[in-house]
Amino acid sequence: MRRRLSARHGFECHSFGYRTTGRAMSEIITQLTHFVDRIDAEEVHFVGHSLGGLVLYRYFETAPCAKPGRVVFLGSPTVKSRTAERVGRLPVFSSLIGRMVHDELVWPQDPRAWRCPRELGLIAGTRPLGLGRFFPRFDEDCDGTIGVSETKLPGHTAHVTLPVSHMGMLASAAVADQVGEFLSHGRFRSL
């Protein structure tokens, strides 16, 4: 994705990494704030995949970047995650998913809505390959891990579905092009 956004759309990309086990969301937000503060650019866009979208949601709730830009979530379960809920109830997995995943996906405490002035684009996949095939039964289109309805955050600017799996969206040229389109123009290209 980084390579495609750079080569096809001219973006300078920076990757922020974090661990979901043993870390509280507040720690990750503090680290992200320091990371963003070191970026020397007039405009800063954000792209988060899966739980990364929720990290960005919490970041913009508490410490929004002062520089202008747009935000895209890729396959982020903004409402709740049936897969995480089901996996989190199994004793063998509950200790592996980490506190942050549990708090944000299994038992979120607050109804989420995008209240940030930045434009937010949401991309959901419809190719059902992933954990969701084994744990929850989806009665809707899904990317194999997250249902399309789980990606819809009230207050978003635009939402698009693409025929990709949850992990496959990271390597998809079509997803990268839609991300580039939204970051550049605040809308997705019509399919």
Place the predicted regions along the sequence by residue:
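C-terminal catalytic-base region of ester-bond hydrolases, centering on the histidine
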Residues: 117-191
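Serine-dependent carboxylesterase/thioesterase catalytic core
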Residues: 5-6, 12-16, 23-119, 138
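The serine-hydrolase catalytic nucleophile loop
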Residues: 1
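Histidine-bearing beta->alpha loop at or near hydrolase active sites
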Residues: 18-23, 163-167
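Anion (oxyanion) recognition and catalysis
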Residues: 6-7, 153
